[in-house]
Amino acid sequence: MAVGEALYRALDAVIKLNESGTKVGLINKATLNVYDETMMKKLVAAPFVLVVEGFNVKTGLGSRFGTELLKRGFKGKYNNIGTNREGSGGLWQQMGYQGLDSDGISKAIKALA
């Protein structure tokens, strides 16, 4: 699942992984405070969920979304990646340093799959 500016990087990673034989999907989380219960039921049944965001990994959507999945009975593997180093977020050139480029997202997915 991706939100905001991380979406296109996550899409690139998902396309490359699917082409190489690792079958994964991608969900665009368009709103931070509203949950689509039909989609949440599908995610609860998934073997793993990775949240990719351009916000701080400690305070962004990922930490909150993981809690919402647990409330609904999620038992799979979970991780969230986002900005994690002071002073190196914002510009696309810095996303690789944060692990938020296509390669970093692919590595995070493979670690869960």
Predicted regions and their residues:
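Thiamine diphosphate
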Residues: 1-113
